[in-house]
Amino acid sequence: MTELKRTPLYEQHRRAGAKLIDFGGWEMPVQYAGVIEEHKAVRSKAGLFDVSHMGEVELKGKDSLAFLQYLLTNDVSRIQDNQIQYSPMCTSAGGVVDDLLVYRYSREHFLLVVNASNTDKDFAWMQAQAEGFEISLENRSGDFAQLALQGPWAEKILQKLTSMDLAQINYYWFKHGEVDGVLCLISRTGYTGEDGFEIYLPPEHAPRMWERILEVGGSEGVQPIGLGARDTLRFEARLPLYGNELGPDITPLEAGLGFFVKLEKDNFIGKEALSAQKEKGVPRKLVGLEMIERGIARSHYPLQKEGKEIGFITSGSFSPTLNKNIALGLIPPEYAQIGETLDVIIRGKAVKARIIPSLFYKRQG
C-alpha cells in the first residue's frame, strides 16, 4: 500500500481531532466540528482551510506567454502583472486535462496552480507540449504550503497580521508581502463562493501561521474547515470539481465554462474540437437539480426521463444554505428546461428531481 502524503499541517489537524481521509493520495482533514457547522461558519463568519496539497508549477522564459496561449483555452494575454486567471487546459479532443489558476509575475514568469491529484499528470502534460518553446518548467509543489481564509470576516482577520492594505487587493489579483513576519504571496481567490484569500508560504512557516490565524480570528468566530465543507461550499457556488463536472470526457462548453474558452484566439490545444462543438451545439449540458422526493443524488448516479437513461449526476449533496438536497447533472440540452422533472436512480429506485437554475448560491455585495 502506498503511504499517504501529508501536508505540513498534519499535526495541527490531528491535535484538533479532525477526521482524516485519503484524498487523492493525501491524508487530509474531511471535517472537524462537522460539515454543516463548518459550511455555515464560512458563509456567515470565516473558515481556514489547509490546501497545501495543491500543485504549483513555475514557468519561466521568453516564450512563457506564447506557451500558455497554446496550452490553455483562456486568453492569458489579457492579464497584467500580479493578476490571476482561471482556465481549463484541454486535450486536442476538447476534453479537460485539468482546470488551473495562472498567476502572472511578468510576461516571462508565471506560477500555475493545479489540482492536487493531477499535479504529476499535469506537469508531464505541460512538458510534452513545450517542444519548440523557449521556456523552463519546474514542479515547485514541495516549496509551498497554502492556506485559504474564506468568508465575510476573512479580510478583517488577516488584516490583523499584516501591514499591507488588503482592501487594495482586488478579486483575482495578488501581492507579495509579510504576514506575521513571513514573506507570503497573498491572492484574493478561493473555492467557496465567498470573499477571501489564499496564502502561499514556505512549508516550515505553515504550522505557526495556521495557529496565528485561528488565534487572532477567534473573536470573529473563525473555524478550521475540512474538505467536506469545501466541497459543499464550492458546489453551492457552482464551482466545478475536476473528476465530477470536468474530465477527459467532458468539455468546458458542456460544463458551462464557455466564458473561459476564447475561440477567437490563435491556435491552442483543443481549439478545433471546441469550435466544432460550439458550432454544432453541445451534446450535453450541466443543469441544477433539486430533489422533490427524499434522497441524496450522488456523483455518477444515472438520470432518467420516462424510464430512458439520459445522463448522470456529477455532484450532489444536502445544501446547508438552501436546507434541501440539490445536485448537478449532465444531460442532453433538449431535456434541460427549468422546471422539467427527471428521475435520479438511487440504489435501483427512481427518485424525482426538478431542474432549477444551477447557481444555487451567490453572495450579496
Curated annotation (Swiss-Prot):
InterPro entries: GCS_T, GCS_T_bac, GCST_C, GCV_T_N, GcvT/YgfZ/DmdA, GcvT/YgfZ_C, TrmE/GcvT_dom1. The glycine cleavage system is composed of four proteins: P, T, L and H. This is Aminomethyltransferase. GO terms for cellular component: cytosol; glycine cleavage complex. It comes from the Bacteria. Its EC number is 2.1.2.10. One of its GO terms (molecular function) is aminomethyltransferase activity. Keywords: Aminotransferase, Transferase. Belongs to the GcvT family. Gene3D superfamilies: Aminomethyltransferase beta-barrel domains, Aminomethyltransferase fragment, Probable tRNA modification gtpase trme, domain 1. The glycine cleavage system catalyzes the degradation of glycine. It catalyses: N(6)-[(R)-S(8)-aminomethyldihydrolipoyl]-L-lysyl-[protein] + (6S)-5,6,7,8-tetrahydrofolate = N(6)-[(R)-dihydrolipoyl]-L-lysyl-[protein] + (6R)-5,10-methylene-5,6,7,8-tetrahydrofolate + NH4(+). It comes from Desulfitobacterium hafniense (strain DSM 10664 / DCB-2). Transmembrane segments: none annotated. The gene is gcvT. It holds the Pfam family GCV_T. One of its GO terms (biological process) is glycine decarboxylation via glycine cleavage system.
